[in-house]
Regions:
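Short, well-formed alpha-helical segments that are part of the catalytic scaffolds
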Residues: 1-15
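Short helix-capping segments at alpha-helix termini
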Residues: 14-20, 43-48
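Alpha-helical transmission elements in cytosolic ATPase-linked domains
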Residues: 5, 9, 34, 38-41, ...
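A conserved acidic beta->alpha catalytic loop
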Residues: 1, 28-37, 83-84
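Hydrophobic helical membrane-anchoring modules
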Residues: 8, 12, 163-188
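Acceptor/aglycone-binding surface of glycosyltransferases and processive sugar-polymer synthases
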Residues: 41, 50-56, 60-70, 75, ...
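Short beta-strand/loop segment that forms part of the nucleotide-sugar
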Residues: 7, 18-30, 52-53
């Protein structure tokens, strides 16, 4: 429902600087609500947009793995289309990764989620620190940027149920955070 809005807002943000070329790899993870038709419309309108249509819902991390097989840029940005992160925040991740990091997560200073959602996020943070070796000072999120080198290493992992952050932590320890604004989820 928001994919067209997010893509066009992101294009607007990138066009303000003229510093970067961008491409979009949009994955429809088995949705039957017309999402892939919207992706095809965007791909017809913009030559730098391509779509991947998964046959069924394989889950967010499998969808991300599928997208990583198609990207070609120096940097790869992961972002949900639920509008919790405004495209105006992308430049913060780009600037931070250019300091020499392999991976940068957007860190939401104040989240606009329910108490239950915030609690489950906290539990995930503690679990990933204990089980996967995530550095204590790093806070993960669904808004991240990685280098091409990291993307190439990540797609070497062949797993039916990948946990993308866990793979990131195995591939690199050169990880940064940058604070970004968090908005109330529009959909999903």
């Amino acid at each position: 429902k928001t994919i067209k809005k997010v893509v066009e807002m992101t294009i607007d943000e990138f066009s303000k600087t003229n510093r970067y070329d961008c491409e979009f790899v949009l994955v429809n993870d088995g949705s039957t609500d017309g999402t892939y038709e919207k992706i095809k419309e965007l791909a017809e309108k913009y030559p730098f947009v391509q779509g991947v249509n998964l046959l069924r819902n394989f889950g967010q991390h499998n969808a991300l793995m599928a997208a990583l097989h198609y990207v070609r840029g120096d940097y790869v940005l992961g972002m949900d289309d639920d509008m919790q992160t405004h495209p105006s925040q992308i430049h913060k991740l780009v600037e931070k990764i250019q300091e020499g990091y392999d991976l940068v997560y957007g860190h939401y200073g104040k989240k606009k989620n329910s108490t239950l959602k915030n609690l489950s996020s906290k539990l995930n943070e503690v679990s990933s620190r204990i089980l996967l070796g995530r550095p204590k000072e790093i806070v993960s999120s669904n808004f991240w940027i990685i280098t091409r080198k990291v993307a190439e290493e990540v797609i070497k992992y062949d797993s039916y149920n990948p946990y993308i952050d866990g793979i990131f932590y195995r591939v690199t320890h050169n990880i940064g955070n940058v604070e970004v604004e968090h908005h109330k989820r529009e959909v999903g």
